[in-house]
Amino acid sequence: MSSLDRKKPQNRSKNNYYNICLKEKGSEELTCEEHARIIFDGLYEFVGLLDAHGNVLEVNQVALEGAGITLEEIRGKPFWKARWWQISKKTEATQKRLVETASSGEFVRCDVEILGKSGGREVIAVDFSLLPICNEEGSIVYLLAEGRNITDKKKAEAMLALKNQELEQSVERIRKLDNAKSDFFAKVSHELRTPLSLILGPLEAVMAAEAGRESPYWKQFEVIQRNAMTLLKQVNTLLDLAKMDARQMGLSYRRANLSQLTRTISSNFEGIAQQKSITFDTKLPVQMVAEVDCEKYERIILNLLSNAFKFTPDGGLIRCCLSLSRPNYALVTVSDSGPGIPPALRKEIFERFHQLSQEGQQATRGTGLGLSIVKEFVELHRGTISVSDAPGGGALFQVKLPLNAPEGAYVASNTAPRRDNPQVVDTDEYLLLAPNAENEAEVLPFQSDQPRVLIVEDNPDMRGFIKDCLSSDYQVYVAPDGAKALELMSNMPPDLLITDLMMPVMSGDMLVHQVRKKNELSHIPIMVLSAKSDAELRVKLLSESVQDFLLKPFSAHELRARVSNLVSMKVAGDALRKELSDQGDDIAILTHRLIKSRHRLQQSNIALSASEARWKAVYENSAAGIVLTDPENRILNANPAFQRITGYGEKDLEGLSMEQLTPSDESPQIKQRLANLLQGGGAEYSVERSYLCKNGSTIWANASVSLMPQRVGESPVILQIIDDITEKKQAQENLNQLQQQLVYVSRSATMGEFAAYIAHEINQPLSAIMTNANAGTRWLGNEPSNIPEAKEALARIIRDSDRAAEIIRMVRSFLKRQETVLKPIDLKALVTDTSLILKAPSQNNSVNLDVVADDELPEIWGDGVQIQQLIINLAMNAIEAISQADCETRQLTLSFSGNDTGDALVISVKDTGPGISERQMAQLFNAFYTTKKEGLGMGLAICLTITEVHNGKIWVECPPAGGACFLVSIPARQGSGT
């Protein structure tokens, strides 16, 4: 008997193999053979020994059991004839060739399929190799066969390839949808320019006709004109962005004097500088000739100066300089003495829709597109733009532009025709920020018998509108910002405060906070009027500090009704406080006493009665980690499961605190929860949180924390039970990401189908605007002018403009890509928006649409866009089913109501279509199941996903009269903390 000695070859080539020499056996031959056989048969993978001709000598037990054979059956027989290779004749022939190759001295390795599981009845994939073994003379005497089961690996690779393919297809579809969306908005923006021109043109004609007549509606004409110009500016900006996205924005190069262009734009701001007492310094050379797109260069300078004047306080300094940089480059610098831009935000400010918001100086108007467009125009010129700190404080913007156009570009000469005037600045937009007679706080002589209302609004047009609505019933005085309002309130407290949120100097939410801090003002009711539809902020303000929150736009009738309610409550409260003060008490004191009394009644001690033996068994054998800590969160005891989860031993945990195992960003919340628990302010709680392990890794767990029963004289002991959910959380995050992508793709596809309907819905109000504008022109042109009819026409123009703006807002909101955030849903707005979206497709398919909603609906938390997508998916399925069938009655009914117990919202989508068979109902919500000729079959699966995200249920019923009825139940919000 000989032993094997495996050596590595000195030089390896295609035909090299490991050199294994045979040596004489030692004196302990029997023992060594026994050990070798134990090891050989104990190997988990396939191992076999063949002679030089490929006949079987030895095979380990695992390989034999996998094929369902014995060694005696195959010993001495060709290896390729064994059970493993009997999948097919081709497999047998392939194995024979591999043996012949190895017998010639070449190492063989490949992936093959064999009958190697369940007694040779199941095919598995193995990483197979044949290693030639030679004696000392170099002759091949054995072949060592090895195989490693890689079936799971192959399946995983195939699944990964499939998922990658699906992801690539989804990404490509999203890209196409994004391009379609950009094209759609470009078309909508372009179509809006015509009706806006038809608003402004007739309006200018009316104003020209009424210029010398002292029309009582002149102020309203100016408001309409000013805001229509603002809307036109935003439409033009969106059109520019769409062109840049489509790479259709080009440059019209012209040889021009940059000094003259810069000087012309700068001169438009001199009036604003005088009104705000700002030192406006321009340093320009006499002449600097460059090849640029003049219009885009003027837009660059205009936007930079506009930002500087927005953020520079009264009495500040603004500089605009033009100079040569390195050879063949012009350098434009615009600096101000405003609050500056933090380094962390200097990249973000050039992103689209980003607006800088800093304490004490907030951008109250605009879309956040100005600097984004500046950057785009600069890069089109192959230039650069940067921002840094200005000397002495403030922001310093630097723009570098090449003086020469790219080689081969067409450059117009100075004599080529150009528009008559350079860029004209609409300074009215920036004059609103300057202090003048209208913007200063206005206080009228008060009459003692009328309640006082203070209006805080930075926009003069809106301020004047609110004042006109209320001045007939109340004593109204105004302030342009929160700081001035706080000063006025200290001297003359109002009965009602009406404030905007986004204002310069002091914002509305900061004003509310300051008012509530002052005892003498804390009882004043506050109404917030804002165009910022932030549901989270709205709920926070309503729950903590304000009595009403009204979104812009709003009707004058609704404003008067809400103001009347708040003022009446304030007057009644004042009378009650006065009555109670005569008795030596106050409402606030009584309320405080009631709350404290109720809190004491709710406190109780929870007794735990578990035996020591039972506790010990649970403690030591539980799969969940159990930790006992003192009030300082120091670890007293930790069970084996916790030690295994975190990697700390029993000695490692001695003297450690749970805070040392807590990531720093979670530590404040954990401390607060623990303090509430110890102080009796919170009951037993469960929280999902992370822990730091000994090896530096982080795990996620569900932690349940409670107080142990406490004996008299003993310190409190805290029980913490930790359930490791790291793998579950990672899987859930991956699933959530895929679901978010799928929901967004579905929403984009839905909006793509609605493009024609939305365009139709926008055209209707725009056509009405044009008709009413022409009618108003005729009525005002009559002698005498028909003022009442003109007024009604203007009111209809405003109404239809609001309707077009609402449609655009609704589309932007529906397409906005964002993470799922659960927050209070405005059901009234959801019902209105959904009805508006479905109106056109239902009419186009001759389907009668009815939307029914209860007056009082349960309050639910969720993602409003996803809920709207769910309803639209169900409704469009119903419309399509009715359209494809020959239905005598074509009816679709959407209903919104509470359930019998009032703890859930029930949404019903009922149609009179052909209905659903029992066979179809069993698979209805399965992914990729569809009864249509086209489509992926994902619509109802996405509806199910959205419902489950909101902890709701979805099901379908078949009414006796025919058709189908889909029902969705979403639980109402329970408490204020969920």
UniProtKB/Swiss-Prot annotation:
EC numbers on record: 2.7.13.3
InterPro entries in alphabetical order: CheY-like_superfamily, HATPase_C_sf, His_kinase_dom, HisK_dim/P_dom, HisK_dim/P_sf, PAC, PAS, PAS-assoc_C
UniProt domain Response regulatory: residue ranges: 452-567
Modification sites for Phosphohistidine: H190, H760
PAC domain segment(s): 108-162, 685-737
Gene3D superfamilies: 1.10.287.130, 3.40.50.2300, Histidine kinase-like ATPase, C-terminal domain, PAS domain
Gene Ontology terms, MF aspect: ATP binding; identical protein binding; phosphorelay sensor kinase activity
Residue numbers bearing the 4-aspartylphosphate modification: D500
One GO CC term, this protein: cytoplasm
Reactions catalysed, as given in the entry: ATP + protein L-histidine = ADP + protein N-phospho-L-histidine
Keyword ATP-binding attached: yes
SUPFAM superfamilies referenced in this protein's UniProt entry, alphabetically: ATPase domain of HSP90 chaperone/DNA topoisomerase II/histidine kinase, CheY-like, Homodimeric domain of signal transducing histidine kinase, PYP-like sensor domain (PAS domain)
Entry's induction text: Constitutively expressed. Is under catabolite repression.
Histidine kinase domain span: 187-405, 757-974
Domain of life: Bacteria
Coiled coil, from the record: none
Domain PAS: 32-103, 611-681
Keyword Transferase appears in the UniProt entry: yes
Signal peptide: none
Pfam families the UniProt entry points to: HATPase_c, HisKA, PAS_4, PAS_9, Response_reg
Enzyme class: transferase
Entry text on domains: Toluene binds to the N-terminal PAS sensor domain but not to the C-terminal PAS domain. The two PAS sensor domains may sense two different signals.
Functional description taken from the UniProt entry: Member of the two-component regulatory system TodS/TodT involved in the regulation of toluene degradation. Phosphorylates TodT via a four-step phosphorelay in response to toluene. Can also be induced by benzene and ethylbenzene.
Protein name per its UniProtKB record: Sensor histidine kinase TodS
Gene symbol of the encoding locus: todS
